[in-house]
Regions:
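CoA-thioester-processing core
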Residues: 100, 104, 114, 120-174, ...
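Acidic, divalent-metal-coordinating active-site segment for phosphoryl/phosphodiester hydrolysis
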Residues: 121, 177-184
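Conserved CoA-thioester-binding segment of acyl-CoA-metabolizing enzymes
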Residues: 1-66, 102
Length: 277
């Protein structure tokens, strides 16, 4: 039986643009708007609900975000929709998208983006809000080409890309609007790992297998969540404040059952059996 089969019942969010299923410590969230999985306000509402569902489910320790089909992870915002809405709604649309992706970043659980196809514009901006990005080798290109439409990447691209690749490289990539393969993305640090999976199904299986290495009993998910919070929050404040946050989070972890099990297993020279509490 595949790892995908071990997940629970497939659930479709209210607008029909995101699906959700979970099991074995992992929530699999899929953008479902073929052919290119372009996003709209309705999709962001669905994605927002999926993130909150995973956040509040104690059984979920890792989130995996993918796109339906094998051509696109996400092609970004639906241009046709953007042309048909008012300037005020455009602003509110961008604001809600920013809030949704911040919710993804603020969720104290590991979030992995599985890029099994093209990942451009707002699609890359969604992926940049994830903690790790795994791409299927040769399956597509990525980039932020919004400048070719006379606008800038408005769903966090100017901020998150520069934090990952540095300011000058980020400006060059966005000002040129060029797209590039996942192999170059790996060199730039935009992608953390390339998968050699030969099909979309095999790629999803490899993502789930990778995600489960961060779940109990293999890993201490509370510690992973605190590491994420320390890094994400700490990089935005002075070093001294970041160190203070680190100490507070460490103190909370010292009181956890997983920390006691980790230290006990180390002393007993055996593999720890973490419980996620």
């Amino acid at each position: 039986m595949s790892l995908l089969d071990n997940l629970g019942e497939l659930q479709t969010l209210p607008n029909g643009l995101v699906t959700y299923r979970s099991g074995a410590g992992v929530a699999l969230i899929c953008l479902e708007n073929l052919p290119a999985n372009g996003y709209s306000h309705d999709m962001m509402l669905d994605l927002d609900q999926a993130i909150l569902r995973a956040r509040f489910d104690d059984a979920v320790q890792v989130l995996v975000l993918i796109g339906a089909g094998d051509k696109f992870f996400c092609a970004g915002a639906d241009i046709g929709v953007l042309q048909s809405i008012t300037p005020t709604f455009k602003y509110q649309f961008c604001l809600h998208a920013n809030e949704t992706l911040l919710r993804l970043e603020h969720t104290p659980k590991l979030v992995i983006a599985g890029l099994g196809g093209h990942c451009v514009g707002g699609g890359l901006e969604i992926a940049l809000a994830c903690d790790l990005r795994i791409a299927r080798a040769g399956s597509g290109k990525c980039g932020l080409p919004e400048v070719k439409l006379g606008v800038l990447p408005g769903t966090g691209g100017t901020q998150r890309l520069s934090r990952i690749v540095g300011a000058s490289r980020a400006i060059e990539l966005m000002a040129s609007g060029r797209t590039f393969g996942f192999e170059e993305a790996l060199e730039l640090g935009l992608v953390d790992e390339l998968s050699a999976a030969d099909s979309d199904e095999a790629f999803v299986e490899s993502l789930l297998e990778y995600a489960q290495t961060f779940t109990s009993p293999n890993c201490a998910p509370l510690a992973v969540g605190m590491i994420k919070r320390a890094v994400k929050s700490g990089m935005e404040v002075p070093l001294e404040s970041g160190l203070a946050l680190e100490r507070e989070l460490q103190q909370r972890l010292f009181a956890s059952e997983d920390a006691q099990e980790g230290m006990r297993s180390f002393s007993e020279k055996r593999k720890p059996e973490f419980q996620g509490r």
